[in-house]
């Protein structure tokens, strides 16, 4: 055994052992309790960052701990490999996305292996490989035939230069983020998942997830956005519109119906189109609206604009004529593309009516009174008693809701309705590096799904995109085909799927990644699913986690899985943050410097007072801590840390820096401190082992001093078991081990009994650290005399008898002030404790001349003597 801690040597040996033994390859073992632990798989961007290290270390600690509980633990890993960054890198470097992606995977896989993760690499999946996306295409065809996937025209942001659809986030100030072209609104045919058909279940089954953070469930509830309201119809006739019919609106405030003074429709609404036929001004306004954002958030904050159409509808209860306006704050895809405007009680309507001098009629008595003068107050939107509403006066919200519904039903002009904010999920992308949509377009037969025996539709991998639209649309060798139904020449779909589709079912594929008979092997899926512990960033709270829940229900309804939810427990890990350093250039731009290139000056209390760039010795500004990011150049390369200190040090620091759900602040001194701690463990173990291993501890013959040491050992086991097993507070578990190390370093080693006690202490330290620092634990466990590997050892169990104290130290107070301590037998009665306290010399001194009025004894803690 080396006298000094040699992490590289130790880690190479441990990893070689695990590889040779296939230590983490698992299979179904009926009768043995399973535990499926999964961290969100990475996008192969090129290099691991510290966020990855933290995410995968958390998952690994949980996996290794559960294995020590005797469970059959599955921890797989794969690659979320399709997506835009590969196309961008391909254009920049003139290389095919496939080549770039596979090279990145090879490099990052080596990095992950060097962290010592207990991963079953035999189950690795790569989403850009045909053997993976074949099953995605198979499921697509099944769902298309069932109508769960359908095709319709949708309004999108179209980049006329790049010839592609952009997400709302990719439109900056009305221009394409890459081309700079003015974005057009276009209606293009796209494929949609009917996620709205599952909205109710997606909402209600959140209640079946007690192991999910409340914050994530709230975010999903808000995103799904269930609202109970009423569908109201405003009739019109030949005189007012040119034909008879009714304008449908959805409202969550039917109690305010008597306060409606106009109706507003979206630019795409049929009434707007009709009114614009002979109205050039309205045509121009509609075109302007269609060029605006389709994002709800943008619509909410933009200036409200509108034009009257000259059309009128009737109020359903009063028959009053209400003008129809086209307004830019009404979205065609929400509700029915029309709103009944009640300016007195809705802020957007109020703003619009004030701007265009439309009537404002108060119909609810709110805390601000019976009238609603400008400017808008939040109180105007409150529920309250109805006023100025005829027969409905005096009713509260629910009473008015019910009474107005009855009145509308009588006239056949309305009824209550539940609506969701959630929209169907459009998955068509005019991109190359994605999963091809398995549809063939035939002039005679329409859209025909690719038959199962012709799957997968393979994406050609030798393509270098140029950014102008989809390369597949310019490749006849890809899209020219025959119709599977009639045999006529046909054209293959050239859009690819949204990359969120691949990550919506990967967790299920891990159960049987090499199965060729279907998307999953049912018996394997039932054995492993649902995932017991899922780990990933809170930024995935809505989209990925909602889509994965949706997909699980789709797979259940296809008979592929038996459970209702994919992830039993969810841990959202915090970000890794680090200091930022910058200089402001003459033109106002910021230049950011990496912490490794900066030298800090500290005061006598170690507080940083200034920073300078090592390269030129000139000062730099300190910008505060922010999430590690390329944009701020404050990332730390995990590989350099592993090379310098070893993987165990990196893992220990990451777990010690903060609880997993909080942000962890990177600190060089913290890393060095973690390294020093592992050196201390090694040093103590070396000193102990070099004297030869002791015999068995005789617990019955322990001295009082030895009992205290053994109590520290079992107290550490008790606390760490709670911290790791129940609370995922790895930082406090590590603190327990550090406290135990302080005790063991001071423990005497004079007798065989002393050394046997240190042996028990070192074995405990090794086992408690095994999930966190697996390499050093692997080495020490064998050196401490065990023939089995530490990964096969059981988590230590506390000896409750060791925690029992023969004597207790009690605090003595006089009138609430600390005046001393007394040692008492743990079995002492309240009377014995009080008697001992009364004769304590400090008590006698501080109660001299006073009368003792009361003695309060808190068993095992303190005695308070009240005297006056």
Swiss-Prot record:
GO annotation, biological process: leucyl-tRNA aminoacylation
CDD domains the UniProt entry points to: Anticodon_Ia_Leu_BEm, LeuRS_core
The reaction(s) this protein catalyses: tRNA(Leu) + L-leucine + ATP = L-leucyl-tRNA(Leu) + AMP + diphosphate
SUPFAM superfamilies in alphabetical order: Anticodon-binding domain of a subclass of class I aminoacyl-tRNA synthetases, Nucleotidylyl transferase, ValRS/IleRS/LeuRS editing domain
Positions annotated to bind ATP: 630
Gene Ontology cellular-component terms listed: cytosol
Main location: cytoplasm
InterPro entries: aa-tRNA-synth_I_CS, aa-tRNA-synth_Ia, Leu-tRNA-ligase, Leu_tRNA-synth_edit, M/V/L/I-tRNA-synth_anticd-bd, Methionyl/Leucyl_tRNA_Synth, Rossmann-like_a/b/a_fold, tRNAsynth_Ia_anticodon-bd
Domain of life: Bacteria
GO MF term list: aminoacyl-tRNA deacylase activity; ATP binding; leucine-tRNA ligase activity
Motif 'KMSKS' region boundaries: 627-631
Residue ranges of the motif 'HIGH' region: 42-52
EC assignment: 6.1.1.4
Keywords attached to this entry: Aminoacyl-tRNA synthetase, ATP-binding, Cytoplasm, Ligase, Nucleotide-binding, Protein biosynthesis
Alphabetized Pfam families for the sequence: Anticodon_1, tRNA-synt_1, tRNA-synt_1_2, tRNA-synt_1g
Coiled-coil annotated residue ranges, if any: none
Compartment annotation: Cytoplasm
Stated family: Belongs to the class-I aminoacyl-tRNA synthetase family.
Family matches, as PANTHER family: LEUCINE--TRNA LIGASE, MITOCHONDRIAL, LEUCYL-TRNA SYNTHETASE
NCBIfam families assigned to the protein according to its UniProt record, in alphabetical order: leuS_bact (TIGR00396)
Protein's name according to its UniProt entry: Leucine--tRNA ligase
């Amino acid at each position: 055994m080396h006298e000094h801690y040699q992490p590289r040597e130790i880690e190479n040996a441990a990893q070689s052992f695990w590889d040779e033994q296939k230590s983490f390859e698992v299979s179904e073992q009926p009768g043995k309790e399973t535990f499926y632990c999964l961290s969100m798989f990475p996008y192969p961007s090129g290099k691991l960052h510290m966020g990855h290290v933290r995410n995968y270390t958390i998952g690994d600690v949980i996996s290794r701990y559960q294995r020590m509980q005797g469970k059959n633990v599955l921890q797989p890993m794969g690659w979320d490999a399709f997506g835009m960054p590969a196309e961008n890198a391909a254009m920049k470097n003139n290389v095919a996305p496939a080549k770039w992606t596979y090279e990145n995977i090879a490099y990052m896989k080596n990095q992950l292996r060097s962290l010592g993760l207990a991963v079953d690499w035999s189950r690795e999946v790569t989403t850009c490989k045909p053997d993976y996306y074949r099953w995605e295409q198979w499921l697509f065809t099944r769902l298309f035939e069932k109508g769960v996937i359908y095709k319709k025209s949708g309004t999108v942001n179209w980049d006329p230069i790049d010839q592609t659809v952009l997400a709302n986030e990719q439109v900056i100030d009305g221009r394409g983020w890459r081309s700079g072209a003015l974005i057009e609104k276009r209606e293009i045919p796209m494929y949609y998942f009917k996620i709205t058909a599952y909205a109710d279940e997606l909402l209600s089954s959140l209640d079946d997830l007690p192991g999910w953070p409340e914050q994530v469930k709230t975010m999903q509830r808000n995103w799904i956005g269930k609202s109970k309201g009423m569908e109201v119809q405003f009739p019109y006739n030949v005189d007012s519109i040119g034909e008879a019919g009714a304008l449908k609106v959805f409202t969550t405030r039917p109690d305010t119906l008597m306060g409606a003074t106009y109706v507003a429709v979206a630019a795409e609404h049929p009434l707007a189109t009709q009114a614009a036929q002979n109205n050039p001004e309205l045509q121009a306004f509609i075109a302007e609206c269609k060029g605006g954002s389709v994002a709800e958030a943008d619509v909410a904050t933009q200036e409200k604009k509108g034009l009257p159409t000259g059309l009128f509808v009737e109020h359903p209860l009063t028959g009053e004529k209400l003008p129809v306006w086209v307004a830019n704050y009404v979205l065609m895809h929400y509700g029915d593309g029309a709103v009944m405007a009640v300016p007195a009680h809705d802020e957007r309507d109020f703003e619009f009516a004030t701007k265009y001098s439309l009537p404002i009629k108060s119909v609810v008595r709110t805390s601000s009174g019976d009238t609603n003068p400008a400017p808008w107050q939040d109180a105007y939107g409150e529920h309250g008693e109805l006023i100025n509403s005829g027969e409905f006066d005096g009713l509260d919200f629910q009473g008015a809701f019910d009474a107005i519904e009855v009145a509308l039903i009588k006239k056949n002009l309305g009824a209550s309705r539940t609506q969701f904010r959630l929209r169907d999920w459009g998955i068509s992308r005019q991109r190359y590096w994605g999963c091809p949509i398995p549809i063939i377009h035939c002039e005679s037969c329409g859209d025909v799904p690719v038959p199962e025996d012709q799957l997968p539709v393979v994406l050609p991998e030798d393509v270098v995109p140029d950014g102008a639209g989809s390369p597949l649309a310019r490749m006849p060798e890809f899209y020219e085909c025959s119709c599977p139904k009639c045999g006529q020449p046909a054209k293959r779909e050239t859009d690819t799927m949204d990359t969120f589709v691949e990550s919506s079912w990967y967790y299920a594929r891990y159960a049987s990644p090499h199965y060729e008979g279907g998307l999953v092997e049912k018996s394997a899926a039932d054995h492993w699913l649902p995932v017991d512990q899922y780990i990933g960033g809170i930024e995935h709270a809505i989209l990925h986690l909602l889509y994965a829940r949706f997909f699980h229900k789709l797979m259940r309804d296809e008979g592929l899985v038996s459970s209702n939810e994919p992830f039993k427990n969810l841990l959202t890990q915090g970000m890794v943050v680090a200091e930022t350093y910058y200089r402001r250039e003459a033109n106002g731009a910021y230049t950011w410097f990496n912490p490794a290139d900066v030298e800090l000056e500290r005061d006598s209390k170690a507080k940083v007072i200034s920073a300078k760039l090592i390269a030129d010795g000139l000062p730099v500004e300190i910008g505060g801590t922010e999430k590690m990011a390329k944009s701020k150049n404050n990332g730390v390369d995990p590989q350099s840390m592993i090379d310098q200190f070893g993987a165990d040090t990196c893992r220990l620091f990451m777990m010690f820096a903060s609880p997993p759900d909080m942000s962890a602040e990177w600190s060089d001194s913290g890393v060095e401190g973690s390294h020093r701690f592992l050196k201390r463990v090694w040093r103590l173990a070396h000193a102990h082992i070099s004297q030869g291993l002791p015999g068995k501890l005789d617990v019955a013959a322990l001295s009082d001093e030895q009992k205290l040491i053994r109590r520290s050992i079992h107290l550490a086991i008790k606390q760490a078991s709670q911290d790791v097993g129940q609370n995922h507070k790895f930082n406090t578990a590590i603190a327990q081990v550090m406290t135990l190390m302080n005790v063991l370093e001071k423990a005497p080693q004079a007798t065989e009994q002393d050394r046997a006690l240190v042996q028990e202490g070192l074995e405990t330290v090794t086992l408690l650290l095994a999930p966190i620092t697996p390499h050093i634990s692997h080495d020490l466990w064998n050196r401490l005399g065990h023939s089995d590997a530490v990964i096969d050892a059981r988590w230590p169990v506390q000896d409750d008898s060791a925690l029992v104290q023969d004597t207790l130290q009690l605090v003595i107070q006089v009138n609430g002030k600390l005046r001393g301590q007394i040692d008492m037998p743990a079995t002492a009665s309240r009377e014995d404790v009080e008697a001992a306290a009364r004769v304590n010399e400090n008590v006698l001194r501080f109660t001299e001349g006073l009368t003792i009025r009361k003695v309060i004894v808190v068993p095992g803690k303190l005695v308070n003597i009240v005297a006056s």
